[in-house]
A protein has these predicted regions:
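Catalytic active-site module of serine/aspartate enzymes centered on a nucleophile-bearing elbow/loop
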Residues: 276-278, 282-327
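An N-terminal hydrophobic leader/cap segment in hydrolases
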Residues: 17-57, 324-327
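Short beta-strand element of the alpha/beta-hydrolase
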Residues: 62-70
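Alpha/beta-hydrolase-fold enzymes
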Residues: 138-224
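Catalytic nucleophile-loop/oxyanion-hole region of alpha/beta-hydrolase
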Residues: 71-75, 101-130
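Short beta-strand/loop motif that positions the catalytic acidic residue
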Residues: 245, 251-253, 257
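Conserved alpha/beta-hydrolase
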Residues: 82-106
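Short alpha-helix in the alpha/beta-hydrolase fold that links the catalytic acid
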Residues: 247, 261-270
Length: 327
């Protein structure tokens, strides 16, 4: 097994291309699962183990927030945000998504279907526990892909709104065919290739987040190429089916984000079937916005957004295209 240390996703692809250029040409699209293939429900009974869910319960809850972490992270990402929201009346349920945290096999891609099925199961369970409480989805990066893909696949889910924090989306990516070919080639020819991802977050994230990514053994550091490919195809699925997400969405994106492009977020917002999508941007936000030093300010804005939705203000007002996307 080959192991190399690289700074991030772009470096991963660069190493991949160097390793595979002499091996073979990119396979035809038919040799791998097309990103747009409709996701099917996994068999019933695939229960979520209790130790995969962390809960912070509000004393008098006004709503439930189901939180979905980013790629390589786990439910402990919300050890600060969870109790902070609970103190303000929002019960939080954070899930170790499959292959992450306590979910085994750690670091292996389970497929899009199980991730989507888990989100649907979380929503349905929360509704069964308290049918009168609105449910919000909060997803960061890969978690944003999972949240959006789940609602696109299961439009019957009753969700009051989605907070998509730098979600994994791929609309408007320049030379996407080239990157797709690179990812497909790696997935097919070198799926077991392991690359070490160990970015330095010290200048962009809060100290607790820096410590977690540096020392927490539950963080995925050695990333398999087929796992990385699965994250990409999940993002593509969410992008291809974004027009089926009817719940109100607020998209957050920062200019310091080296992973997601603003145009990808803006295209998703424009595609909302009811015009109920907002885009917030900030010059200083990194990719992991909710783990930046000013995360409480951002969280307060999200609470305000949820309160506006609860008061029907968003649904009642005239749809408008978000200003950050008018450039």
């Amino acid at each position: 097994m080959t192991r190399r240390r690289i700074p991030g996703a772009v470096g991963l692809l660069a190493v991949l291309l160097l390793a595979l250029t002499a091996c073979a040409a990119a396979p035809e699209r038919e040799t791998v699962r097309a990103a747009g293939t409709p996701v099917k429900e996994v068999p019933a009974g695939a229960a979520i183990a209790p130790d995969r869910v962390r809960r912070w319960s509000a004393a008098e809850p006004v709503a439930v927030v189901i939180a979905l972490h980013s790629f390589r992270d786990h439910a402990g990402a919300y050890d600060a945000l969870g109790p902070w929201l609970a103190d303000r009346g929002y019960s939080v349920q954070a899930l170790d998504q499959r292959g992450h945290g306590t979910s085994e096999p750690h670091g292996r891609w389970p497929g899009a279907e199980p991730l989507i099925s888990d989100v649907a199961a979380m929503v349905r369970a929360a509704q069964a526990e308290d049918p009168d409480r609105p449910i919000f989805l909060l997803g960061e990066s890969m978690g944003g892909s999972a949240a959006l893909a789940s609602l696109a696949t299961h439009p019957e889910l009753e969700v009051a709104g989605v907070m998509a924090i730098a979600p994994g989306l791929r609309g408007g990516i320049p030379a996407r065919g080239f990157w797709d070919a690179a990812v497909r080639t790696g997935e097919v020819l070198a799926g077991g290739l392991t690359l070490t991802i160990d970015p330095d977050y010290s200048d962009s994230l809060a100290p607790a987040a820096v410590e977690r990514f540096s020392t927490d053994p539950r963080i995925i550091r050695r990333v398999r190429m087929d796992t990385y490919a699965g994250v990409v195809w999940l993002a593509q699925y969410a992008t291809d089916h974004i027009g089926h997400v009817a719940a109100p969405v607020v998209y957050l994106w920062g200019e310091q984000d080296g992973t997601i492009q603003r145009e990808s977020v803006c295209m998703a917002a424009r595609a909302h079937p009811r015009g109920q999508a907002e885009v917030w941007t900030d010059a200083d936000w990194p990719h992991l916005i909710l783990h930046a030093p000013d995360w409480q300010t951002t969280a307060a804005r999200l609470v305000d957004w949820m309160q506006r939705l609860a008061g029907d203000e968003v649904g009642a007002r005239t749809a408008r295209r978000p200003d950050p996307c008018d450039d």
